[in-house]
């Protein structure tokens, strides 16, 4: 529970209309699942982010920084602390020659559109990834042979004390669905993306081709957090799950997608408990049949 004193203090940092108490997180995740957060803030700029993180850190109040809620499962009990949401208002994208500078809340789809409009190639792979660039760099998001580590040159982050740091590509230590930020207490504020000059029509055609492949193979018609499991070395998670006979397997309202077994979907008003139980069952079944450990890609809070 967040006290009235804390809420009043937060009103010094951002407008009162950007502060929500007991906010249902099901409204803010692509899974459409999640209980209430004690306090939900919509951040507009880096200065607000710096001041609020510093304040919450001083009071030792737990907080979680949220993009657009993809790749995330919030528990049925909600979140005891403060959710800092950046996607709604902190999402500016600027073009400086062949360099794109994006605020952390900018959707990767928006960055891809801006790149295409400016005839910049190299970001087409990310056009359909359902997340913000801030969350994307933390996970080193990728698809169709591309990864953010290939185009990100610098990441501006805010530490818990409100200091701004600049991390270059090497310092980010990008790996498969990971980066240095996953283990460091930093919040992504801004990302620099270096692209190359291209032909607008060719870039658009490539984006449309990848979008068609997504629509054909992924269950975009249902709420989900995107791909549920990381790819185990030497295997494909969806293929193992299908071979284990789990295609369409359902617990409560959560289901292993019939369209793509690598996705757990919210088929019918699923709870977080349903999803967690289904993920656990899939993991144990695949482990017992094939000896392969499936690691969830979805973040759970």
What are these regions, as identified by a protein language model?
Residues 59, 66-68, 151, 222-223, ...:
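Short, basic and Ser/Thr-rich N-terminal targeting/leader segments
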Residues 121, 151, 170-172:
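Short beta-strand or tight-loop elements
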Residues 134-136, 140-144, 205-210:
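An N-terminal domain-start capping segment
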């Amino acid at each position: 529970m967040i006290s009235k004193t804390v809420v009043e203090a937060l009103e010094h940092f951002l407008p009162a209309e950007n502060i929500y108490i007991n906010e249902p997180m099901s409204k803010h995740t692509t899974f459409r699942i999640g209980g209430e957060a004690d306090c939900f803030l919509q951040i507009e700029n880096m200065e607000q982010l710096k001041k609020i993180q510093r304040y919450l850190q001083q009071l030792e109040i737990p907080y979680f920084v949220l993009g657009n809620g993809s790749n995330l499962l919030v528990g049925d009990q909600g979140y005891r602390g403060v959710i800092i949401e950046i996607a709604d208002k902190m999402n500016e994208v600027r073009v400086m020659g062949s360099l794109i500078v994006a605020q952390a809340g900018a959707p990767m789809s928006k960055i891809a559109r801006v790149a295409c409009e400016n005839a910049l190639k190299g970001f087409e792979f990310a056009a359909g990834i359902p997340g913000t660039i801030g969350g994307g760099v933390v996970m080193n998001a990728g698809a169709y042979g591309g990864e953010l580590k290939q185009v990100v040159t610098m990441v501006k982050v805010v530490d818990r004390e409100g200091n701004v740091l600049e991390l270059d590509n090497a310092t980010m230590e990008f790996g498969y669905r990971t980066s240095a930020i996953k283990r460091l207490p930093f919040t992504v504020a801004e990302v620099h993306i270096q692209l190359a000059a291209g032909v607008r029509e060719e870039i658009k055609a490539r984006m449309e081709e990848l979008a068609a492949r997504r629509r054909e193979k992924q269950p975009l018609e249902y709420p989900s957090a995107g791909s549920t499991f990381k790819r185990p070395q030497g295997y494909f998670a969806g293929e193992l799950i299908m071979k284990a006979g789990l295609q369409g397997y359902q617990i409560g309202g959560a289901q292993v997608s019939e369209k793509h077994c690598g996705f757990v979907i919210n088929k019918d008003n699923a709870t977080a408990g349903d999803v967690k139980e289904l993920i656990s069952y899939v993991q144990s079944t695949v482990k017992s049949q094939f000896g392969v450990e499936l690691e969830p890609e979805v973040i759970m809070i």
